[in-house]
């Protein structure tokens, strides 16, 4: 995946996450963890992952379902798009 595609995925994930949890996209850092830093409950995180289906992202893929922080999710989604 080229750098532009990675940036597009990162922007998509961060924008959707910001909209979902009600924060400004600039407040979301790559290293933020979903449960601790972004204060998402496991149910909220699960719902967020399920909502990624509208972007044709498979939320049940192991790398996506097991992501603990924003950058892990971005990398997992990026690798899924390449496959």
Name what the model sees in each region:
Residues 2-49, 54-83:
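Phosphopantetheine-dependent thiolation modules in NRPS/PKS and related acyl-activating systems
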